[in-house]
Amino acid sequence: MDVPAFRERLLRLAPKDPLVLAVSGGGDSVALALLVKEAGRQAVVAHLDHGLRPESPLDQAFVRALAERLGFPFFTERVEVARIAQARGENLEAVAREVRYAFLHRVAREVGARAILTAHTLDDQAETVLLQLLQGTARATGIREREGIVVRPLLAHTREELRAYLRARGEAWREDPTNQDPALDRNFLRLFVFPLLEERFPAAKRALARFAEARAEEEGVLERQAEARLLPDPRFFVPAFRAAPLLEAPLAVRRRALRRLLEKLGLRPEARLVLLLEEALRGRPQTLPGGVLARRKGGTLFLLPPRPRLPLPPGFRRPAPGDYLERPSGRKRLVDFLAEKGVPRELKPLWPVRAEGNRVVEVLGLYPPPPEEAHMAEALAEAASAFREGEVPVGAVLVLPGRVLRAHNRVEGLRDPTAHAEMLLLREAGPEARGGRLYVTLEPCLMCHHALAQAGVEVVYGAENLKEGALTRFGLPTRARGGVRERECAKLLRDFFARLREGCRSG
C-alpha cells in the first residue's frame, strides 16, 4: 500500500481538516482509518449501529477502541433501521443507506468537517457497475469519487490490497456475517459471479472500474446538457415541463433528462420507466410507480400525483357545474377556458376560482390575464404587423422601468439578417436593457440568445423554435420561460409559412 500516494490523493480530494471517517469495523474502513492517521490528517470516527444484528454492540466497541487508539474523537448512534423501513414500506438497504448518510452529515456539521470519507474500494466499484447494468438502471456510472462532501479515496485499491496492508501491520477487523448471504444481490455477485469471471478474465474488476470512470466523465458532460432541457412550466401547481426541448434533444440527452425527472419524483431511474416517459412525451399517457400519471397536453409534459394538491386561497373555491366567465368576446364555460389554457383534465375540478354564483370573476393565475399574458398580447400584435409586411411573424416587447419598447422582425425590410425583433429592441434600449424582461412570440435563436444573455435580459417566450431555438434546437442552458400564449404564437407562424408555401405553388 503506497501511503505517500494515498496522502497526495487525499489532499487533492479533501484538502481541509477535520475529516469524518465512516467506520463500520470491517477491513476496508479500518484500513481507511489507519491510512488517514498515517497521512497525518485530523479526523473523527463515526459509527452507526443499524440495529440489524445481535453482534452490532461488539462492532461498536471495536470501532470505539480503534478510534481511541488512533486519537480520533468517536461519534456513534443506534437506529432501528428495520423498523423505519417497515413503517415506510421501503427497501431495507435503501433506508439503511439514507439513515447512514444522514448520520454522517450530522456529525460533519457538528465538527465543522468539509469531507466525509467512506471506504469504498475497486471491488465495490466493479460490483456496483455490474449490478447497475443487470438491474437496468441505464447509467452504469458506478460509485463517484466525490459527491458533495462525500469522498471515496480508496476506489483505486482492491479489497485484497487493504487486507494485505492490515495483515502486514498486525491489525484486526470485524467480519459482517450478512456479507455471506447470497440472497442479497451484491453478495451473490461477490460470492459466485466474480470468481467465475476472474477465472476467465483476471482483470475483470479493473476493467469494470475503468469503464465506470470513463462513463462518469461522459455522464458529467451529458448531464449538464440534459439538465438544460428540463425547462419547468411554472403556470401549473404540479411538476410540469416544456415538452419540445425534450422531444428535440438527441436521444442520449433526452433519456438522461428523463432519468433526472424520475429522480426528482423519488423514483429509481430504471430504463423501463424512462421508456414510459418517452411514450408520455409522444402523447400516450403512462402511469409510473406511486400512481404518478405522466401525460402531455399541448406543449407541456405533466407529472400528476395521484392526489394533486392545489392551493385554495381565502375567498376561492373549487369549480362547480355551470361555472362560466363573462369576457368581452362573450360568455365562455369555465371548463373550456381551462382547456384553452392547457390545464389537464385531472386538474380542472381542483383549479381555484373566485365566483359570484356561477359567474367566475377570477381563475387563480389565469384570469384576469396575468401581466405576462398582456405583454405577450402586445408581442403578438407586433408579430401580426410582421406578418402583414411579409416578414417571419415574430414580435417582442421589452419591459423596462417606466417604459415598454416594441418591435418585430424587419430582416427583409431593412435587408439586415440581424434585424430580429430581439436585436432591434436591444439596440434601441442600449445599456438600459440590463435587468429588463423581454416577451417574444418565438424562442430566441442562437444570436439573440447570446445577445440577451450578455445584456442581462430575462426572457419569456411563446412557442418553441424547433428549427433555430437556442435551447430546443441547440441545447444551450437558459433561464427563459416558455409556453405563454403558445397556441396563438404558433398559429401565427403556421399561417405565415402556409401562405408562403401557397405562394410558391402559385408562382
From Swiss-Prot:
The gene is tilS. InterPro entries: APOBEC/CMP_deaminase_Zn-bd, CMP_dCMP_dom, Cytidine_deaminase-like, Rossmann-like_a/b/a_fold, TilS/TtcA_N, tRNA_Ile_lys_synt, tRNA_Ile_lys_synt_N. One of its GO terms (molecular function) is zinc ion binding. Its main location: cytoplasm. This is tRNA(Ile)-lysidine synthase. HAMAP family: tRNA_Ile_lys_synt. Zn(2+) binds at H420, C445, C448. Ligates lysine onto the cytidine present at position 34 of the AUA codon-specific tRNA(Ile) that contains the anticodon CAU, in an ATP-dependent manner. Cytidine is converted to lysidine, thus changing the amino acid specificity of the tRNA from methionine to isoleucine. ATP binds at S24, G25, G26, G27, D28, S29. Belongs to the tRNA(Ile)-lysidine synthase family. One of its GO terms (cellular component) is cytoplasm. It is found in: Cytoplasm. Pfam families: ATP_bind_3, dCMP_cyt_deam_1. NCBIfam families: lysidine_TilS_N. Residues 370-500 form the CMP/dCMP-type deaminase domain. Keywords: ATP-binding, Cytoplasm, Ligase, Metal-binding, Nucleotide-binding, tRNA processing, Zinc. It comes from Thermus thermophilus (strain ATCC 27634 / DSM 579 / HB8).
